[in-house]
């Protein structure tokens, strides 16, 4: 897993270049948002169970067919697996927020997930919607925690939804 700094260094090192103005601005932005990133992670960690529970409730309110007989979250085991997966997405999104890099999502969450879900018959659409709902809830929680700028929170959630979302082939 790389963070924003190591990713930037790697890119410039591979090119054999010194940091230019863009690199310096990128580093400056990352470090300026560092305290807020850590505060966001702290707030998410303190409320993780509630965030996952709210996400599940809202998702199942919007898509009740998921918890009806024959639905992918029908039975206690499947329902629990859905909440477990939402918890994974939240945890890894938090890592990505702190790192300022989406590498951890590629390495630990997204590689092979679409194929795994497809092979198990897990619908991708509700998963994507759940991640979007989670982003909304996280941003509300962070606003309530007094973290004024939460724009950096969008990136990992949007990245996961984009990567998992249906793709035209």
UniProtKB/Swiss-Prot annotation:
Its main location: membrane. InterPro entries: Allophycocyanin_b, Globin-like_sf, Phycobilisome_asu/bsu, Phycobilisome_asu/bsu_sf. Contains one covalently linked bilin chromophore. (2R,3E)-phycocyanobilin binds at residue 82. It is a peripheral membrane protein. One of its GO terms (cellular component) is phycobilisome. One of its GO terms (biological process) is photosynthesis. Pfam families: Phycobilisome. Gene3D superfamilies: Phycocyanins (1.10.490.20). Keywords: Antenna complex, Bile pigment, Chromophore, Electron transport, Membrane, Methylation, Photosynthesis, Phycobilisome, Thylakoid, Transport. It is found in: Cellular thylakoid membrane. The modification N4-methylasparagine is found at residue 72. Heterodimer of an alpha and a beta chain. Light-harvesting photosynthetic bile pigment-protein from the phycobiliprotein complex. This is a protein functionally equivalent to, but with weaker absorbance than, allophycocyanin beta chain. PANTHER family: ALLOPHYCOCYANIN BETA CHAIN, PHYCOBILISOME 32.1 KDA LINKER POLYPEPTIDE, PHYCOCYANIN-ASSOCIATED, ROD 2-RELATED. Belongs to the phycobiliprotein family. This is Phycobiliprotein beta chain. It comes from Mastigocladus laminosus. The gene is apcD.
